[in-house]
Structures are given as structure tokens and as C-alpha cells.
Amino acid sequence: MDCALALVARGRPVREVCFVLGVSRSHMTALRTRKADWVDRRKAPPRPDDDQLLSDIITVAKDLPTYGYRRVWAILKFQGIDGSPRMVNHKRVYRVMRDNNLLLFRHGSKPRDTRRHDGKVAVQTSNTRWCSDGFELACDNGEKVRVAFALDCCDREVMSWVATTKGIDAGLVGDLMMQAVEYRFGAGSTAQTPIEWLSDNGSCYTAIETRTFAKQLGLKPVRTPVESPQSNGMAESFVKTFKRDYARLANRPDSQTVMRELKLWFEHYNEKHPHSALGYLPPRRFREKQRSIN
């Protein structure tokens, strides 16, 4: 800009100089007509004090060390510390965590999964499709706890779960389905309209007793293609989240301890776990929002 001003002062045309040097003509005119005693009184906005925010972030990170900056931000915004939500921008949370080395370690790019699934498991309304799957948790003493759960494919709430140190059989899956139906519609009730019950091809799900009982409850059994676990991707994703954010961080000395902790873990997931697909709201808060809109 100084070069452009010098050329114009020597008599060069303003339009020609601005075009050749690529500067703004309006800016050039403003500088040429500015008074000699002009003082730039513009000031940068005051930088917010990050000490309290950093303290709140550390408090969240201590309890939930697997949460990235987005979920930390969601906890602060929607739940807050001691129940007091904090209005803060997610970019500011990222900056504070970055400057204080609190961001999670970024893993390298994962190899592309060749087991592609082009279908869509998620649905727009609750009680349209439920998915179910099971997983295993190993204890320090060698015992294993096997867990099965029922998850709504819209609001992501875990409606029911069962656990055992033995295998998941048709009887336990029947209990799982009945608990889910009674949780959503009341004791002794059945689904008002058929609800898809999505599962894999495990023997406990394909058993005649399971399919018959599901239909009695108003559920419509739907199974994934053989050797296609990605077709039940929502349940698979939940298992990954549950193990990463809860099971791996906890002491698991024996099966009795794990059985006691499972209830707390599922409750925390439903009440407080921010979900990206739900606008970073926990499942139950998302359901409350749904009901208020409808």
C-alpha cells in the first residue's frame, strides 16, 4: 500500500496503480483523504480469562479422560460443573485444551473397511426400530461377563440390558425384549405398532422361542445378512463406545464387581453421555426434547 501511495503522489492514475498492484481503490481513497492528525483508536476485543474455563475442563477430563474437546464442550454447555451449564464456544474449548496439551492423541488413519454397508440403521422417530447385540468383558481373575442390550435406533437410549457369567441364551433375550417393551410402554403392555428388532444371527436371536416371543410383544425380528456385522453398525458402535469410555477405565477384579458397575455405566450413558448424532445431547435429554416438540 505504501508503494501505491507513493506512485499516486507522483501523478500516476489511481485506477491504474490499484489494478496493477492489486489493492483496493476505496482503501486507497480513504488513506489519501485521511487527516494528518488521524489516530487509530481501534482496539482488539479483550481476551477472555481462561483460568476458570481451564479448571472446568480439567474437572471434566479427570472424570472422563476418553472425551475429546467436542464432548468436553457438550458437558460444559448442557450439563456444566455442579449442574451449572456454561455458555462457551467449542472453538474456545479446543484452543484452551490445545494450549494446555489436553487434546486426545490423534491416531493414524485407519485402513479402509472393505465390509461396506450402504443401508441405513438410524431412523427418524423413536420406537420404530430397536437393535440388539452382545459383548464380553474379561475380569482380572479370569471370569467373563457377557452382556446383551437393547438400543433405540433413533434416540440411542439403552432401554434394557442383561448380564451373566454364562452364555446369552434365548431366555435372556426374551427377558431383554420384555424389559424394553415394558420400559417404553408400561408393565404388561405390548408395542402399539410393530417395532423392528434388529440383531445378528446368533443362536439366541434366531431361536424359535425368541422369534415367537418377539411377535407376541409386538416386535418384528429382523436379522443382518450372514457375515455382515456392519449391517448392525449402531449396536457395534455402541459396544465400542461402552468399552472405551466405561469398561476399560474401570477396575474389573471379578464378575460381581462388574455386575454392580454395569448399572451405573448404563445409567451414565443414558443420562450424561453426549452423542454426536443427537446434537451432543445425552439420549434421555434428547427424548425429552423430542417430546416437547411433538
What are these language model-derived features?
Residues 1-294:
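Charged DNA-binding/catalytic regions of mobile-element recombinases
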